[in-house]
C-alpha cells in the first residue's frame, strides 16, 4: 500500500493551461470574440482542472507543481471573474491600467517560477519563459493602451500554449511507451 505509484498529474495541468491559453490568445490576435467558449474553458479546464492537478502534485510532494498549477488555475478563475462580473452588473468594467498591473504581477510571479524550471526539461523552461514574456507584453499593452502590443502578445501566447500541450503529450506518450516518443529536453 505504501509503494503505490502515483500518476503524473502534470499533463492534466499542462493541457488545461495550454488549451485555455491558446483559446484566449486566438482572441488576442483577433480571430475570435471573447465569448462563452473561452470563459467556460477558463473556469473548468484552465481553472478547476489545473487546481486539481496542483493538489495532486501536493500529494506527490512536488512544491513547484503545487504552486504552479494551483496558482495558474486561480489565475484563470480570477480572470474569468474580472471579465464576467461587469457583465453581471456586479462591478464596473476593469480599468485597463489596473488590469495591466494585475497581469504584471503575474509576470513577476512567472519569472520567479521560470527560475525554478532551470534544472528541469527544456520544454518546461520554454513554457515558463514564453509565459513570462506573454504576461509582460500584456501588462505593457494594457497599461499603455496599445492594442498592437496586445495583438503581438497573442502570438506569443499561441506559441506558449502550444508548447505546454507539446510538453503534456510528451510526458504522457513517453511514459506510456517507456521511451522518448516526443523529446522534451529532459535534464539528467
Curated annotation (Swiss-Prot):
Phenotypic consequence of gene deletion: Mutant shows a partial reduction in acetate uptake.
Membrane topology reported for the UniProt record: Multi-pass membrane protein
PROSITE patterns per the UniProt record, alphabetical: GPR1_FUN34_YAAH
Substitution effect: residue 164 to G: Acquires ability to transport lactic acid
Residue ranges of the TM segments: 14-34, 36-56, 64-84, 98-118, 123-143, 149-169
Pfam families: Gpr1_Fun34_YaaH (PF01184)
One Gene Ontology molecular-function label: acetate:proton symporter activity
Example of a GO cellular component annotation carried by this entry: plasma membrane
Activity regulation field: Transport is inhibited by the protonophore CCCP.
Residue intervals on the Cytoplasmic side: 1-13, 57-63, 119-122, 170-188
Locations listed in the record: Cell inner membrane
Effect of residue 131 to V: Acquires ability to transport lactic acid
GO terms under biological process: acetate transmembrane transport; succinate transmembrane transport
Comment on pH dependence: Optimum pH is 6.0.
Membrane side Periplasmic: residue ranges: 35, 85-97, 144-148
Record's keyword terms, sorted: Cell inner membrane, Cell membrane, Ion transport, Membrane, Symport, Transmembrane, Transmembrane helix, Transport
Family: Belongs to the acetate uptake transporter (AceTr) (TC 2.A.96) family.
Role played: Uptake of acetate and succinate. Transport is energetically dependent on the protonmotive force.
Protein name: Succinate-acetate/proton symporter SatP
Lineage: Bacteria, Pseudomonadati, Pseudomonadota, Gammaproteobacteria, Enterobacterales
Gene: satP
Amino acid at each position: 500500500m505504501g509503494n503505490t505509484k502515483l500518476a503524473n498529474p502534470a499533463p492534466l495541468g499542462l493541457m488545461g493551461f495550454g488549451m485555455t491559453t491558446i483559446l484566449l490568445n486566438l482572441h488576442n490576435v483577433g480571430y475570435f470574440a471573447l465569448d462563452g467558449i473561452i470563459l467556460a474553458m477558463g473556469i473548468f479546464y484552465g481553472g478547476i482542472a489545473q487546481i486539481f492537478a496542483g493538489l495532486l502534485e501536493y500529494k506527490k510532494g512536488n512544491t513547484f507543481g503545487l504552486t504552479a498549477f494551483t496558482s495558474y488555475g486561480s489565475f484563470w478563475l480570477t480572470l474569468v471573474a474580472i471579465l464576467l462580473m461587469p457583465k453581471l452588473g456586479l462591478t464596473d468594467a476593469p480599468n485597463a491600467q489596473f488590469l495591466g498591473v494585475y497581469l504584471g504581477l503575474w509576470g513577476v510571479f512567472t519569472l520567479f517560477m521560470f527560475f525554478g524550471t532551470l534544472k528541469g526539461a527544456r520544454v518546461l523552461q520554454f513554457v515558463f519563459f514564453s509565459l513570462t514574456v506573454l504576461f509582460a507584453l500584456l501588462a505593457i499593452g494594457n497599461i499603455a493602451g496599445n492594442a498592437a502590443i496586445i495583438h503581438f502578445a497573442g502570438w506569443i501566447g499561441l506559441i506558449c500554449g502550444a508548447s505546454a500541450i507539446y510538453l503534456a503529450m510528451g510526458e504522457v506518450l513517453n511514459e506510456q511507451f517507456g521511451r522518448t516518443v516526443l523529446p522534451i529536453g529532459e535534464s539528467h
